[in-house]
Curated annotation (Swiss-Prot):
The record marks C149 as: May be catalytically important. Its EC number is 3.5.4.16. The gene is folE2. Pfam families: GCHY-1 (PF02649). Belongs to the GTP cyclohydrolase IV family. This is GTP cyclohydrolase FolE2. Converts GTP to 7,8-dihydroneopterin triphosphate. Pathway: Cofactor biosynthesis; 7,8-dihydroneopterin triphosphate biosynthesis; 7,8-dihydroneopterin triphosphate from GTP: step 1/1. GO terms for molecular function: GTP cyclohydrolase I activity. The keyword Hydrolase applies. The keyword Transferase does not apply. Keywords: Hydrolase. One of its GO terms (biological process) is tetrahydrofolate biosynthetic process. It catalyses: GTP + H2O = 7,8-dihydroneopterin 3'-triphosphate + formate + H(+). It comes from Pseudomonas fluorescens (strain ATCC BAA-477 / NRRL B-23932 / Pf-5).
Amino acid sequence: MNALTLPDIAAQASRQTLPLEWVGMCGIALPVVINNQPSAAKADAGVSLDDGEARGIHMSRLYLALEMLEQENLTPALLRRILQRFLDSHEGLAHSAYLRIQLDLLLKRPALVSPLAGWKSYPLSIEARLKNAMFHVELKIDVPYSSTCPCSAALARQLIQQQFIEDFANRPLQHADVLAWLGSPQGVVATPHSQRSNAALHLRLDDFIDELPLIALINDAENALGTAVQTAVKRADEQAFALANGQNLMFCEDAARRLNLALRRSPGINAFQLRVVHAESLHAHDAVAESRWNWEA
């Protein structure tokens, strides 16, 4: 009995001659290696189908090429090799290749004062394209932080001043009395509203960069804002966090400008756009600001 040849329907001609901009797979579960640590990720992989007479692509070839991601540290060079393999396995069919990797980047972050540390998750998307020998990599990173409203802080200070006048009117001021008052509930009769906020960064990397500057970018963003969300804390850390918020009062406009100026100085960045969202505790809506640099709209 002769062995039957398995049919390859994708290699057949299409009944409708029409090229397609993108064909591939989305949501592929796989491990990737970042900073020499394996991480669970999801990948979208595809190519253009430029041969309009071809019925389809060979998705299994894309899938198998992704095995390279679990074998070595994720770098722009590795991404380019994978995309080139996409194209080599579809010679005559495709001229462009695309790969997106999504994961939560886990970084251990130190406390502000104490020796404690804890893990913080940063949603990350890495997008790579190869077309006509032109290679591009873009990063999308979410950076959480705390924002305290400058207007609310001014109003709170005014209420504290008024309370001070009421409590010390027509009284000689004694250092010990004022110090005790400042440490009492009357001394903090009002507090400004603050909220957890988020900076969504979309960055285009230089074409010939050797490494993905993930940690450096996150550090630059958090240093510019000054109020990074914390992990494990003691009371001394919480006090330092309160001080950081008081010294970095921010509208969403302030946060966007700080990030813009900081990211311009970050090495390896060719262009970026960003969006900051302050999930207002005063209002039922968000305060939002956007900014970009060297980015074609």
